[in-house]
């Protein structure tokens, strides 16, 4: 008789389902393969997690009530027991169903497609490797001499050679016959790292990232399974790569928030990497010039070993950093910054201007009645994008034509408030019409021009590069002298406990692009809050003082890393339903919370409406993770959301907006 199969599906049901295998596959091992199966009125892809020759009737079930699968999708197993164990851990830790976790782990498409992983790197040749500094050598020796699942942090100033440490450690691991996972925040923004990996490892390396189609990703997955690759580089999801004999996991730019998934399961690649390294009994190496506060605290406690790199490998002094108070400046670009852009060009060098807001203007405002044009589906102002001639919502993507008068009072006395990268681009072009200027932001990323623009800038074909936070990530430019941060205040006052941490990291990362190969590098930070600790510490490159102040404040206010948080968001198309569900949940949670733990909320999310859904949130807070996790699990088991209300759970949220 054909075996009985235990399946899980990508649905929010924390249970498995028993199906009959079709006769065509009788006798085949189906565990680890995907199948097409009827699920209620739908047909879904299921994951086979076990099989049995024992009839369900032996356990009291009626055989005739069990459905038969429609067909088997995979010729060979797509996942093994290692992946299944990881998915079980994720389901438990991140409060989701096993099928949802497994769906995040394995590729989703049915057919394979061949991909040349490093096609964009063709023709790149390896440059002569430079002599390692003493600090680099110590870091490499510490990593390669490690036995067991030890965590390290390569903490170095920008340009200190962290990538070389990672690559040399990877070479040593490969020489022992083991494999390596190399995580980066965003593949499209780390082309130089890709080139380094290509010239070091060639066909041994594979790329896994979100820009691959489902079929391309499946093809790469299969080749990794067949051991055609022993190095995998990629963004967040590359942590699940099916490598055999895993010997090292590297996480570059550990502080980057893109390592946290915004969708179920809302996993953080750092936590999954720690799990995989513990399972494989191998070292985990993180690195950044600006560690997350959690990572810094782990280093202070000795849970993670810090490996410092204090000097730039190209030599020379770090750039000089000036803070300009623009509270009395009439224009966005201060006189000081404009003068330095001109001097930099005259000296034959390049400039980079940073503003963490895309678009032309931030909002449409009426001077007569104070009306601000907002998205009808989201509780956020629409942003004016001059190039496409539309007001756009950066949450749901909705666009509409700009109004000629105030929609509320019909006044013509209106204005566009705030500025974005498009505005700066126009302003710089007006000031320097003869300069070659380019812009890099999310809009440019979608058009696929980022890599081309960055290569042109690196080749000296662009005089001034404008951009959002993506220009802060992993680029080296030989003749970049000046970096201007147009408005350091953009993220400082966001109602999120990580606001100062993010702003400090951005300022440090952007500043780190300046003067890597130029002796007189300069960074100009424009702000209306020159005394803010994040600005002061960024000006002096003083990480230790910033983290000390931030940790003291977090401890006083009972925020991570001194407590653990779990966030619940209740969303509904009806405001009243979302609110009622949140208050009902609050009553249930309050009754369950043990001594020392508390419930924050309910309250409307900072962004109270997204894509037409109203949002309320509750935060669970406790010094011990098992405590808060148990309360959250009990709550999810007991709470029954009303029709039309959806509950989202987020363990260790990176933002609370």
Curated annotation (Swiss-Prot):
Chain sites annotated for binding Zn(2+) 2: 375, 378, 393, 396
EC number of the protein: 5.6.2.4
Cofactors named for this entry: Zn(2+)
Entry keyword set: ATP-binding, DNA replication, DNA-binding, Helicase, Hydrolase, Isomerase, Metal-binding, Nucleotide-binding, Primosome, Zinc
GO terms classed as biological process: DNA recombination; DNA replication initiation; DNA replication, synthesis of primer; double-strand break repair
Keyword Membrane annotated: no
InterPro entries in the record: DEAD/DEAH_box_helicase_dom, Helicase_ATP-bd, Helicase_C-like, P-loop_NTPase, PriA, PriA_3primeBD, PriA_3primeBD_sf, PriA_C
Intervals of motif DEAH box: 252-255
Main EC class the enzyme belongs to: isomerase
Co-factor binding comment: Binds 2 zinc ions per subunit.
Catalysed reactions listed for this entry: Couples ATP hydrolysis with the unwinding of duplex DNA by translocating in the 3'-5' direction; ATP + H2O = ADP + phosphate + H(+)
Function according to Swiss-Prot or TrEMBL: Initiates the restart of stalled replication forks, which reloads the replicative helicase on sites other than the origin of replication. Recognizes and binds to abandoned replication forks and remodels them to uncover a helicase loading site. Promotes assembly of the primosome at these replication forks.
Quaternary data: Component of the replication restart primosome.
Protein name per UniProt: Replication restart protein PriA
Organism whose genome encodes this protein: Treponema pallidum (strain Nichols)
């Amino acid at each position: 008789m054909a075996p009985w199969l235990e399946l899980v599906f990508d649905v929010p049901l924390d249970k498995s389902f028993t199906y009959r295998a079709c006769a065509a596959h009788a006798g085949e091992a189906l565990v680890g393969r995907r199948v097409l199966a009827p699920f209620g009125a739908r047909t879904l892809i299921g994951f086979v997690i076990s099989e049995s020759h024992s009839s369900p009737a032996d356990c009291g079930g009626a055989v005739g009530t069990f459905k038969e699968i429609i067909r088997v999708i995979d010729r060979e197993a797509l996942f093994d027991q290692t992946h299944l164990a990881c998915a079980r851990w994720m389901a438990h830790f991140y409060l989701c169903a096993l099928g949802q976790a497994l769906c995040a782990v394995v590729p989703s498409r049915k057919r394979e497609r061949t991909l040349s992983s490093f096609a964009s790197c063709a023709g790149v040749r390896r440059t002569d490797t430079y002599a390692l500094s003493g600090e680099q050598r110590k870091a490499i020796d510490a990593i390669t001499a490690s036995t067991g699942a030890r965590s390290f942090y390569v903490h170095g100033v920008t340009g200190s050679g962290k990538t070389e440490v990672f690559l040399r450690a990877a070479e040593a691991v490969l020489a022992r016959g083991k494999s390596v996972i190399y995580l980066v925040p965003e593949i499209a923004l780390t082309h130089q790292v890709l080139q380094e990996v290509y010239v070091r490892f060639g066909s041994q390396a594979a790329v896994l990232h979100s820009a691959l189609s489902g079929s391309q990703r499946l093809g790469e997955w299969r080749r990794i399974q067949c051991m055609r690759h022993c190095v995998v580089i990629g963004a967040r999801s590359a942590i699940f790569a099916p490598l055999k004999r895993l010997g090292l996991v590297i996480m570059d730019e550990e502080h980057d928030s893109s390592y946290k998934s915004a969708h179920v399961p809302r996993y953080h690649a750092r936590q999954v990497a720690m799990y995989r390294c513990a399972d494989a009994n191998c070292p985990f190496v993180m690195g950044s010039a600006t560690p997350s506060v959690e990572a810094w605290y782990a280093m202070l406690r000795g849970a993670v070993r810090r490996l410092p790199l204090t000097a730039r490998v190209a030599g020379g002094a770090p750039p000089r950093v000036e803070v300009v108070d623009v509270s009395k400046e009439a224009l966005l670009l201060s006189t000081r910054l404009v003068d330095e852009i001109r001097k930099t060009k005259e000296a034959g060098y390049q400039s980079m201007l940073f503003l963490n807001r895309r678009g032309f203007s931030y909002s449409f405002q009426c001077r007569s009645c104070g009306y601000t044009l907002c998205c009808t589906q989201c509780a956020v102002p629409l942003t004016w994008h001059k190039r496409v001639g539309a007001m756009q919502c950066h949450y749901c993507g909705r666009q509409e034509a700009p109004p000629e008068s105030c929609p509320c009072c019909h006044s013509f006395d209106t204005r566009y408030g705030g500025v974005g990268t498009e505005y700066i681009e126009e302003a710089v072009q007006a000031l320097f019409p003869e300069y070659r200027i380019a812009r890099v932001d999310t809009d440019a990323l979608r058009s696929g021009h980022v890599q081309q623009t960055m290569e042109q800038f690196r080749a000296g074909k662009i005089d001034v590069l404008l951009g959002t936070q993506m220009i802060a990530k992993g680029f080296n430019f030989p003749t970049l002298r000046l970096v201007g941060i147009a408005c350091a205040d953009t993220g400082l006052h966001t109602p999120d406990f990580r606001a100062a941490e993010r702003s400090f990291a951005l300022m440090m990362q952007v500043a780190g692009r300046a003067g890597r190969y130029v002796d007189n590098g300069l960074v100009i930070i424009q702000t209306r809050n020159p005394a803010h600790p994040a600005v002061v510490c960024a000006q002096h490159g003083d990480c230790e003082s910033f983290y000390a102040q931030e940790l003291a404040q977090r401890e006083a206010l009972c925020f991570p890393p001194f407590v653990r948080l779990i966030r619940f968001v209740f969303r509904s198309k009806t405001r009243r339903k979302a609110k009622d569900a949140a208050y009902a949940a609050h009553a249930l949670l309050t009754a369950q919370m043990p001594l020392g733990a508390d419930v924050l909320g309910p309250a409307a999310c900072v962004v109270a409406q997204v894509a037409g859904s109203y949002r309320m949130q509750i935060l669970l807070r406790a010094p011990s993770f098992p405590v808060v996790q148990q309360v959250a699990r009990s709550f999810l088991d007991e709470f029954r959301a009303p029709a039309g209300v959806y509950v989202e759970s987020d363990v260790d949220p990176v933002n609370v907006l």
